[in-house]
From Swiss-Prot:
Organism superkingdom: Eukaryota
CC cofactor: Zn(2+)
Record-given protein name: DNA-directed RNA polymerase subunit beta''
Species of origin: Porphyra purpurea (Red seaweed)
Keywords for the protein's UniProt record, in alphabetical order: Chloroplast, DNA-directed RNA polymerase, Metal-binding, Nucleotidyltransferase, Plastid, Transcription, Transferase, Zinc
Length: 1224
């Protein structure tokens, strides 16, 4: 009865039940009442929720998006602050980088303030607002999205990750402008793409984690270790991320816990910590607790029940046979997918957390500033501040003597001074978050807003010589002033008629460039229609070739130009009209079949003199230098390259024309066949025309097997000829034959052409045309062809006698008056002058170009053809003329616009001549200058200010200008070099986790785990610790560091993962050592062995008086740890299969099938869960049962437990029941 009564007493929770409270409620029900009742309650809650949601009729309309009225004033104050920043920049008090950072931080703070206003406004005016309830109950949406709906969208990042300093001040309720919309679209697209890519990354991370930890199974109850790890609050920059109470739940104590004041025992060793006990420990004021942990567990290749603690799903001690490795891998991998998705929802909105801001908790005065602990620094906003060089503290004392102590870590920037009054919630300091922010070195170009003269102020410059150029770098920060004026570029060849201090008017010529010809001739002006470029040609020579004309005709189905002479010789043009030609250029080729053969053959020269090397622009043929003859022995050559089995004829066969040689290949001529084959492949079939004579005695031919037989000569005593023939000896089926082959003789006469005579009769000095006969074949060359070739070509070739690069020769087609289709052939030589070449350095508005000569005019050498004049645009004075070498030639004019005159009205001035004035400074007691500049003149009546613009450059900036140099608007003054944080939502999260777990050796990150491990190991060895202890302790240090680093990434995204999951993974990464010297253990240097295994080996070596192996701890990334696992089956199924299996085979490895993966691959029952107890004896089970009785659970009523045991029968209950039966 009592148990029923205790159950009927309700538990009262007086809170708003949002998503988190709902979680806690269900966990409480699950822990106290079991899975069935908790599920039932969750069902009822769901029905309750739907019922009231239906009755209330929650809907979402545009009216629910309420914009807080304070938004307008907040925006106005922010814009005012931005104006002040811009003014500071214009005064040269901050650099462009500091301005950008200040603008971004100002907008970011405005956006955050507005977010708070939105929350307050909803809370106070409309707590039942649909949007507010939805976001804050945790049902849908988050505060960041609500901020964009009713606050402001804020700052966005561009595709490169750079923040755009133009914020979107409107929200979705007010609507976006076109600019806002375009800026927004960057982030939205980025979110979609990133999500797709990162989901795959996250999946691969999970796979690697599973692989590295799949063999971690709970195999024993207690490993009897005395070691553990100390748990405390996880703090990051003064913010508690995971409190001790949260961290303790589900752990087992490694030592007794006593009350620090009373001394009473709170909990004993090996007791598991329930949430209630954790609360009690924290209430007692205990800050650090030693607990058992998977990283200190002594079990070989597994974890014991006590070191693991609770199975967090059930809220009680983990079962034997539980595959905790896989649970750990999934627990770490799964949130990765959520992290990948998170970018998508905020859509690239920038959230700036470059520094953690420390606020004043009370109104008061800041005291206790120890100046020895600080150094003066410039903040990223360009303000002076103090930075702590060591951890220190400041005190804020209110008027009521209330004191608040604030601890500052090293590197914190203090923004207020000693004894300065601060108000509550004022930002007093910033601590950097640099340790986990990726810093990159960036550059920012400072561009001039004015044209004018450069003046350096307080700038120390250091010059460094690099191979080709000198780099100027600022050693100290300072100002670059640009004194306003008009700057004109002057071409190098220009003549400058003005002098320094001359007065000029609009239209005055400042510089003049003249275009002069080298040769006399006739002027021809070409105006390019597509641009304003004008070319002027001076024609030094022009000649028309007589007795020939050009017309178009169709040759080989292609329209071509044909040159015909009055002797009916026809030439095919190889050039086109107005084409520029060089010496040896082939203009045309004679159309003739005189030297065309019908097939291939052998070529022999007779009394023919040809050039030794190939000539012409293409170097493709030999010039024939004298008359002579070409002897041609024809033969038809088919290139086959087919198998010899496909042949339809045999070597030595005599065939008729049209015979099929191989399939679809026919002979064109009759003759005897010669087959050339290699390795069973027929390369060529040669058909040799001629007559065959059978020989009775071969040896009478002496030593020759081929040659020419002239008329009147005899061969073999009885073979004679009446014309020149070619003979060769052939042997067919051991019978000798003589093949007599016909020879065609081609005569090549001396070149005489009316065309040449006509040309030479003209007195041409520079360009001629000559006829040249050319051949592409060498003496004795065998020409492989079926259709025939041109043995000799007759070409019309240009002969140019001048070698001046300024003179160009060209072919011209001159229209004939009597015919529209015919042209005369002209040759001209001319000099080209381009007007573009003289005005490309000068802007069009400042210059005018005049062509002084007219088309068709005949001019003498060194005549001015055109001139470009650079003219003044304004009235003023010539202040500077720079014509030094190695710099641009420039002229500086000062006009009335560049000076500003102040009427003093007899007032005393507060400035002197030469003073630099910044905008907002006083000239006299009542006159404020709105411009920056330099005072150039002061009289009783007036003061003159030369307008200028100051640019602040930081130290280590790269200067692009010299002092007193002239610069134009938009040119680079300097490049500022600075460090900036890489922006990123979770995009930095996943790669960061991967980097930690893969133990990457990054150089630019402060945390290099490999270096830390080495350093701590060396330190412990120096302190005299044994090798094993030094390795174990250095491992433990790095383990805790890695766990903390992973937690920081996940916590920054609001994802809670229990430490023990990360510890299981880290344990696998830090289980191996690298052998340095194997001594007598049989291990090789560089081999990776488990720490416990090598220590056991060393102990056995010591007992046998043998030398121990030396080693050092090594940190493996998860991929490497997977590949170096004991099981080669598991490693091979992960990556590098061939390599793993080869190494395993060579070293004769055994796989004991301890893990899950190798058993799955083999096809056995996995050694976890129900498959775990297969080999255990009953006695062991009995012992475990007794031990389990001693383990305390949480403080829920025993009656509740007993009453609910039969509601759900899970594996464990069934197994325990079965085991108890067998023991009894």
């Amino acid at each position: 009865m009592n148990s029923r009564k205790s159950l009927s007493q309700p538990s009262f929770s007086n809170k708003v039940i949002d998503k988190n409270q709902l979680k806690n409620l269900i966990v409480w029900a699950f822990r106290n009442y079991g899975i069935a009742r908790a599920a039932n309650m969750a069902d009822k809650l769901k029905d309750l929720g739907f019922h009231y949601a239906t009755q209330a009729g929650i809907s979402l309309s545009l009216e629910d998006l309420r914009i807080p009225p304070s938004k307008k004033s907040l925006l106005l104050s922010t814009i005012e602050e931005i104006k002040n920043t811009e003014n500071k920049y214009r005064r040269g008090e901050i650099t462009t980088v500091e301005r950008f950072q200040k603008v971004i931080d100002t907008w970011n703070n405005a956006s955050e303030s507005l977010k708070q206003e939105v929350i307050e406004y909803f809370k106070e005016t409309d707590p039942l607002n649909s949007v507010y309830m939805m976001a804050f109950s945790g049902a849908r949406g988050n505060i960041s999205q609500v901020r964009q709906l009713v606050g402001m969208r804020g700052l966005m990042a561009d595709p490169q990750g750079q923040i755009i300093d133009l914020p979107i001040s409107s929200n979705s309720r007010e609507g976006l402008t076109v600019t806002d919309y375009f800026i927004s679209s960057y982030g939205a697209r980025k979110g979609l793409v990133d999500t797709a890519l990162r989901t795959a990354d996250s999946g691969y991370l999970t796979r690697r984690l599973v692989d590295v930890s799949q063999d971690v199974i709970i195999r024993e109850v207690d490993c009897k270790t005395k070691k553990g790890i100390i748990l405390e609050d996880l703090v990051d920059t003064q913010k508690v991320l995971i409190n001790l109470e949260q961290a303790l739940a589900g752990r087992v104590l490694a030592e007794n816990v006593f009350h620090p004041e009373k001394g009473s025992l709170i909990a004993h060793t090996r007791q598991d910590i329930s949430p209630n006990l954790a609360q009690e420990i924290v209430r007692a004021g205990i800050k650090k607790v030693l607990v058992r942990s998977p990283v200190t567990c002594n079990s070989r290749s597994s974890v014991c029940q006590y070191c693991y603690g609770w199975n967090l799903a059930h809220g009680r001690l983990v079962d034997l046979g539980e595959a905790v490795g896989i649970i750990a891998a999934q627990s770490i991998g799964e949130p990765g997918t959520q992290l990948a998705m998170r970018t998508f929802h905020t859509g690239g909105v920038f959230t700036g957390e470059l520094a953690e801001q420390i606020y004043s908790p009370i109104d008061g005065k800041l005291t206790n500033l120890d100046f020895l602990s600080y150094m003066e620094v410039r903040t990223r906003h360009g303000e002076q501040a103090l930075m702590t060089e060591k951890p220190t503290q400041v005190i804020i004392e209110s008027s009521g003597k209330q004191k608040s102590i604030i601890n500052l870590s090293k590197g914190t920037t203090l923004l207020v001074d000693n004894n300065e009054v601060v108000s509550k919630d004022q930002v007093i300091a910033e601590s950097p978050r640099r340790n986990r922010l990726m810093i990159e070195r960036a550059q920012k170009h400072v561009l001039s807003d004015l044209s004018g003269k450069i003046c350096f102020s307080n700038l120390t410059v250091e010059e460094t010589d690099n191979n080709q150029y000198t780099t100027r770098i600022t050693k100290t920060g300072g100002l670059i002033w640009v004194l306003s004026g008009e700057v004109y570029n002057i071409p190098d060849s220009a003549n400058i008629p003005v002098n320094k201090a001359d007065q000029v008017n609009p239209g005055t010529i400042l510089a003049q460039t003249e275009l002069i010809n080298q040769y006399s001739g006739k002027v021809r002006i070409y105006q390019n229609t597509s641009s304003s470029i004008t070319n002027i040609q001076i024609i030094t020579e022009s000649v028309t070739v007589p007795a020939c004309y050009i017309r178009t005709d169709v040759i080989n189905k292609k329209e071509s130009y044909i040159l015909e002479t009055d002797k009916k010789q026809r030439f095919l043009f190889k050039s086109f009209p107005d084409q520029k030609i060089s010496d040896g250029h082939i203009v045309a080729e004679l159309i003739s079949d005189t030297y065309k053969t019908t097939s291939g053959g052998i070529i022999k020269y007779l009394d023919l003199n040809v050039s030794k090397k190939k000539t012409g622009p293409e170097k493709d043929a030999y010039d024939i230098l004298s008359p002579g003859y070409i002897l041609w022995i024809s033969e038809e050559t088919h290139e086959i390259n087919k198998d010899s089995s496909l042949l339809l004829v045999n070597n030595g066969d005599v065939i008729e024309s049209g015979t099929e040689l191989v399939k679809n290949i026919f002979s064109k001529s009759s003759g005897i066949i010669e087959i050339i084959q290699k390795d069973g492949i027929v390369r060529e079939i040669i058909i040799k025309p001629g007559f065959i004579y059978k020989l009775t005695d071969f040896y009478s031919i002496h030593d020759k097997s081929r040659g020419f037989l002239r008329p009147g000569e005899t061969l073999h005593g009885n073979i004679s000829t009446d014309k020149l023939v070619y003979w060769e000896y052939i042997e067919n089926e051991q019978t000798p034959y003589i093949l007599i082959r016909p020879v065609i003789v081609y005569s090549i006469p001396e070149i005489k052409s009316s065309l040449i005579e006509n040309l030479t009769s003209q007195k041409v000095n520079q360009t001629k045309l000559k006829l040249v006969k050319r051949t592409v074949f060498r003496d004795g060359e065998r020409v492989k062809s079926i259709d025939g070739v041109h043995l000799v070509t007759t070409n019309l070739v240009a002969e140019i006698n001048h070698h001046d690069p300024n003179l160009v020769s060209a072919i011209e087609f001159l229209a004939k008056e009597d015919s529209s289709n015919c042209f005369a052939l002209g040759l001209s030589t001319f000099e080209t002058l381009s007007i573009k070449s003289i005005d490309n350095k000068v802007e069009k508005e400042q210059s005018q170009t005049r062509i002084i000569v007219s088309d068709g005019e005949y001019i003498q050498p060194l005549t001015v053809v055109a001139s470009t004049e650079i003219i003044s645009m304004s009235k003023g004075f010539v202040e500077e003329i720079h014509v030094e070498k190695n710099t641009s030639r420039r002229i500086l004019l000062t006009t009335s616009i560049d000076n500003k005159v102040f009427d003093l009205h007899q007032q005393n001035t507060l400035v002197q001549v030469g003073d630099w004035i910044r905008c907002g400074d006083l000239i006299s007691e009542s006159i404020i200058s709105l411009d920056s500049g330099q005072i150039t003149h002061i009289s009783q009546e007036s003061a003159t200010l030369r307008i200028a613009r100051p640019y602040l450059v930081s130290n280590a900036a790269i200067l692009h200008v010299d002092n007193n140099a002239l610069i134009r608007k938009g040119e680079t003054l300097a490049v500022l070099v600075f460090d900036r944080a890489k922006t990123g939502d979770i995009i930095q999260g996943l790669p960061r986790i991967e980097e930690i777990l893969e133990a990457r050796k990054k150089t630019d990150v402060l945390l290099n785990p490999h270096d830390i491990l080495d350093a701590s190991f060396n330190l412990y060895i120096e302190c005299g610790l044994a090798l094993y202890e030094a390795a174990r302790l250095s491992f433990q240090e790095i383990q805790l560091l890695l766990v903390k680093e992973v937690q920081l990434v996940y916590q920054s995204q609001g994802v809670n993962i229990s430490d023990k999951h990360i510890e299981v993974i880290v344990r696998q990464m830090t289980s191996k050592v690298k052998i340095e010297n194997g001594e007598e253990t049989g291990y090789l240097p560089g081999e990776l062995v488990e720490l416990q295994k090598i220590e056991q080996t060393n102990k056995s070596m010591t007992s046998r008086n043998k030398l121990n192996a030396s080693y050092r701890p090594i940190l493996l990334g998860i991929t490497q740890a997977s590949l170096n696992t004991e099981s080669f089956i598991s490693a091979a199924s992960f990556q590098e299969t061939t390599k793993v299996l080869t190494e395993a085979a060579i070293s004769g490895k055994l796989d004991w099938l301890r893990g899950l993966k190798e058993n799955v691959i083999i096809g056995r029952l996995i050694p976890a869960g129900t498959g775990f107890n297969m080999y255990d004896s009953h006695n062991d089970v009995a012992n475990k049962k007794d031990i389990n009785k001693n383990i305390s659970t949480d403080n829920s009523p025993p009656s509740v437990r007993d009453d609910l045991d039969d509601i759900i029968l899970d594996d464990r209950t069934a197994r325990n029941y079965f085991n108890n039966k067998t023991v009894d």
